[in-house]
A protein has these predicted regions:
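Intrinsically disordered, low-complexity, charged terminal extensions of DNA damage-control enzymes
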Residues: 1-113
Length: 113
């Protein structure tokens, strides 16, 4: 699977905000929260969707499949309206259940956010 996550960041009144949504698909990540996701059928599509924004690409191995994931930071003046997402304070992100893949990538971003 080829996953492309976008971490939208918007600063307002000295607070940083982002968008997340809760997964409802019947898989191991059901009920976990994640950033805005686009999924691609193959590597060519995934590579073609790359942007010049700060990003981290990684491979995550599950027991039954290999996930190729890219997380891209997009700093915006206004958060986009995206169905099924919620706007939260970045400082409250730890109150939401995230996948191990997402947590590991956030650690790698470190001071970029």
């Amino acid at each position: 699977r080829w996953l492309d996550y976008t971490i939208y960041l918007c600063k307002s009144n000295d607070e940083l905000y982002t968008l997340i949504h809760q997964r409802t698909e019947q898989d191991i990540w059901k009920h976990l929260y994640e950033f805005v996701l686009n999924e691609y059928d193959n590597e060519e599509q995934w590579l073609a969707a790359a942007t010049s924004h700060s990003s981290i690409a990684t491979t995550h191995i599950l027991s039954h499949q290999r996930l190729h994931a890219r997380f891209t930071i997009r700093k915006v003046d206004i958060l986009p309206v995206i169905p099924d997402t919620i706007c939260i304070r970045w400082s409250e992100l730890d109150q939401y259940a995230l996948s191990r893949l997402t947590l590991k990538v956030l650690e790698r971003f470190g001071g970029l956010i």
